[in-house]
A protein has these predicted regions:
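Helix-coil boundary and interhelical linker segments in multi-pass alpha-helical membrane proteins
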Residues: 1-13, 85-101, 132-139, 172-184, ...
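N-terminal signal-anchor transmembrane alpha helix
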Residues: 2-34, 254-258
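Alpha-helical transmembrane segments in multi-pass membrane proteins
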Residues: 10, 14-15, 19, 23, ...
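Cytosolic, membrane-interface loops and tails of multi-pass inner-membrane proteins
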Residues: 25-67, 204-237
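Multi-pass membrane catalytic core of lipid/isoprenoid biosynthesis enzymes
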Residues: 52-89
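Interfacial segments of multi-pass membrane proteins
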Residues: 62-65, 88-91, 124-154, 166-175
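Loop-to-transmembrane alpha-helix initiation sites
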Residues: 140, 144, 157-165, 175-190
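Final/C-terminal transmembrane alpha-helix of multipass membrane proteins
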Residues: 240-262
């Protein structure tokens, strides 16, 4: 009974802390006349504006406030989960997995915050902040290898953006073989997919109208993160056949690293 009670309490605490939206708080301070929910993008040869579907997080806030404030918001989003995770993992319950529930529900709160009519961000900063506490080595290895595999082997910006997160499932399975870690990794991936549904629906609609390419190009120019990812994609494409070679090497290296993680508790 105590276990269930602590799981519920950990989840509630994580959710309410995660629901704090620094993007909305700072936007209200710096640009009170602006709204993250009403951001529009004007397409060429079209009288209508398209609503920008990026959630209400650091990336979208950076379009209005600038890159510097976008970075600050991203850091604050990381800190808001890092602090309670450290408290739960290392001080309150060092031998229990309650911190994983704080992390998972912190992400749910960030993406669907109760304070803001369940309109939140997409949780990239929250996921990174949580994983730094849960397994910092997983962040370093999977972000690097995920980007290399996504850009070099698959040649896709979308895969590169999310592959590192998908890789957390086999990583936790091989390294810990603990049901709590595995459930956390699966749940985080499900949350990430569900939070992208508005973007997916918009992309399908724009693709039917033949406006998807222009929307992507204009949206990419609006944020430093997207511009950086686009530059990385262009760089890897410029490598030609060497991109595939680098991708295969990255895949082999990934298999070796994961094998070491499983056999020697890396």
């Amino acid at each position: 009974m105590n276990i269930i009670l602590f799981i519920i309490l950990s989840s509630i605490i994580g959710y309410f802390i995660g629901s704090i939206s620094f993007s909305r708080i700072l936007l209200k301070i710096k640009a009170p006349s602006k709204s993250l929910d009403d951001l529009q993008l004007k397409l060429d040869n079209s009288e209508d504006e398209v609503k920008v579907m990026m959630g209400a997080g650091a990336n979208k806030a950076s379009i209005i406030l600038g890159t510097k404030w976008g970075i600050i918001i991203g850091i604050l989003d990381m800190i808001k989960v890092i602090i309670p995770l450290i408290i739960f993992r290392y001080f309150l319950f060092p031998n229990e997995a309650y911190f994983l529930y704080v992390a998972a529900f912190g992400l749910i709160g960030h993406n669907w915050p109760i304070y803001y009519r369940f309109k939140g961000g997409r949780g990239h900063s929250v996921m990174l902040g949580s994983l730094i506490v849960i397994d910092w080595l997983a962040v370093v290895i999977n972000v690097i290898l995920g980007n290399l595999l996504g850009f070099a082997l698959i040649g896709s910006l979308v895969f590169a953006s999310y592959l590192w997160l998908w890789m957390m499932i086999p990583w936790f399975l091989l390294r810990y073989f603990n049901i709590n870690f595995i459930i956390y990794a699966i749940l985080v991936n499900i949350i990430a997919i569900l939070s992208q549904i508005p973007e997916i629906k918009l992309y399908v609609k724009l693709r039917k109208e033949g406006k998807d390419r222009e929307y992507k190009e204009k949206l990419t120019k609006m944020t430093a993160q997207f511009r950086g990812l686009q530059k990385m994609e262009d760089f890897f494409k410029s490598l030609g056949i060497w991109r595939i070679v680098l991708g295969i090497i990255s895949l082999i290296f990934t298999i070796v690293i994961y094998t070491f993680a499983a056999l020697f508790n890396l």
